[in-house]
Amino acid sequence: MNKSLKIWIPLIVTYLIFFAWYTNLSGPLTEQEIETYKKIFEESNSARRDSGQWEKAFKFMSEDDGKDFYMVNFLDRNESPRTMEATGEGATSLDLQMHYMEYMWPQQFKRASHPVFFAFVLNPALDIVATQGMEDWDIVAIFRYRSRRDLFEIGLNPIFDERHEYKVEALDKTIAIPVETPFITDLRLAL
């Protein structure tokens, strides 16, 4: 085997493994999967069960195109969170958020989902229309998800509900908006 092949074959194999991990090869959610997720959610003891937001989430499921997407998060931290069991007395909002992320990081990474952008906000919103109380944010974070299936597998795990309470207490308000993935930022093409 010549020297060039000894270099290229491992590189190609590594890229193919990365591509298979990073790409949703399962296609869009099927009706059966959606019904299974709905059943899991309805049978759960989740505090989120009565939230009208779940109708929007199920609509998001049913419109699945099988592609990856970004979740844009605006976070306003709670400066005086109540005491929570796992983080103890005197825990800051960051402590609570990190307890939540201890579950999220490994769940996201094993599904080729990861942070894309994270920054502290410099100033209150400079342009805001038709809403009150949305001027102030502390953090903007963008996460890439390989698929909607991955998002719902993470979010419907019973451990998620336990940890999600910590995220809720860590924040005064938050908005999470799914958006299309910009083509130019796709790591499969950058590599």
Model-inferred region functions:
Residues 146, 150, 188-191:
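An acidic-aromatic pocket/loop used at catalytic or ligand-binding sites
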Residues 139-144:
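Active-site scaffold segments
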Residues 83-84, 147-156, 160:
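Short amphipathic alpha-helices within nucleic acid-binding modules
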Residues 171-172, 176:
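Catalytic cores of eukaryotic secretory-pathway lumenal/extracellular enzymes that build
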